[in-house]
Amino acid sequence: METLRHATNATGFPLAREPPPTLIEIRKLSKYYRRGEQIIPVLADVNLDIELGDFVALMGPSGSGKTTLLNLIAGIDKPSSGTIKVGGVDIARLSERDLAAWRASHVGFIFQFYNLMPVLTAFENIELPLLLSNLSRRERRERVGIALSLVGLADRADHRPNELSGGQQQRVAIARALITDPTLIVADEPTGDLDRTTGEEILSLIDQLNRELGKTILIVTHDPKSAEKARRLIHLEKGVLAD
């Protein structure tokens, strides 16, 4: 756990050694899509600060812009206007190449449907983000071993996804999100495909990443029960912050 906390980021993309207290600073953020001559607004003039080490839940009805906002903060998509600064870096102004390098180094992703490679073992799925790093094979194996232990799957390293339960697959996905030691972990409906008991176990594990490793967590959920672990709730209504 300590090794993951203090390890150097794998891709080495430049970022302040000690990120500022406000990790995410969003100003006048808007996103729209064009369909022919029609403009379809998704987010409108969003202003938002998220502190380093916070655990934030984004809530709102379907179509409110939750996942779009998550994707913009994580550098998966770019805004139509406005700024998104993460750790002092205005990611909206980065080239696609630099944005990909920033994303690989500083953001861990957890998805509803796990997104594991079916032909790879749990160990290999977790190791995947490190293969383009300058870490040696021994260093990669050590880091993956720590991550597997952290999520309680040290005895499942050689199992492929079809040999694991849904909850175990999501634990592998969490370990993969953690493996590059990112500052920010984003989770889009991480319990949406799990039963209630397993979902609560996954949320407790995500909460552990926040409390014990200091990871900033941003989670999208429809479920008020799933949002209870968060320290801050942000509500979106028709692309506008409602809180």
Where on the chain are the PLM-derived regions?
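ABC family nucleotide-binding domain
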Residues: 21-236
